[in-house]
Amino acid sequence: LINVLLVDDHELVRAGIRRILEDIKGIKVVGEASCGEDAVKWCRTNAVDVVLMDMSMPGIGGLEATRKIARSTADVKIIMLTVHTENPLPAKVMQAGAAGYLSKGAAPQEVVSAIRSVYSGQRYIASDIAQQMALSQIEPEKTESPFASLSERELQIMLMITKGQKVGNDSNLLIV
């Protein structure tokens, strides 16, 4: 039997997930928390195998709660279930100690599959999120300055231009 803790600041979300999991053989919702602090306390004092954690909550959010739970109760597996799927967040969450990452738009069967996978010791990342993470490694977003790719000489010329100096063929200015 897989004991699951639901953590979300929206009662309606918790009730919906609870309802989905009620009918699943081998999975039992053993508790709920509406904030990260309560989730951390709950995991330290109760038997829980898997935590379905929301990212954005009052107080400490899902990322910090994941760090704290992963540090203090290594046997508890955490799945981030969130609307925030853009990079670099999934990687940060996994580095913080989560075993899984799902979008709140996931199908109920995918949530069940994720719970079973992380309980068995595997990691689970929704395929669309995993693809996005992989692509960001191949094609990192252009976040550095456009001047970062200039040679030292090209940078000197750019600085001269910004100071209003004429560059032309003046070898004295360019120190050729």
Which residues does each PLM region occupy?
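Acidic catalytic/metal-coordinating carboxylates
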Residues: 35-38, 60-64, 85
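Active-site residues of response regulator receiver
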Residues: 54, 82
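Helix-turn-helix DNA-binding segment
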Residues: 144-176
